[in-house]
């Protein structure tokens, strides 16, 4: 007996495992309200660098945006509804770019790499959004004597 794909459902590979649950689709096609979640703490640092070095990271059609400023950011998310109240941490590196295609133009941040410390959001983000994500250990920040430390 063969299986039939349900058009309104979201699938991840391999599709014969059935519809995939994740942040954009819960059980019985339920969407998540995320009214008071996630609880997020974010930190970042930005620095001016050599634009020619950044340009070597860009695919064809992209060019460096305003200034060659790299931003390294970390976000620590807790109480995420689609993760049954669990959370995860991310660390990303971005810089401003412009895309000037024959039809479309856009300005934004180019995400060079994104590290995460939980498999569920890595798989769903890669499969459903096309983000290239890498697993790594990202401990929560520690606060000691009024100073917050991220390692």
Task: Label every model-predicted segment.
Residues 14, 50, 118-119:
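Alpha-helix initiation/capping motif
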Residues 14, 59, 129-131:
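Glycine-centered flexibility motif
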Residues 22-76:
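N-terminal ordered "arm"
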Residues 11, 15-25:
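Terminal interaction module
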Residues 1-10, 25-34, 67-151:
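Short basic (Lys/Arg) and small-residue
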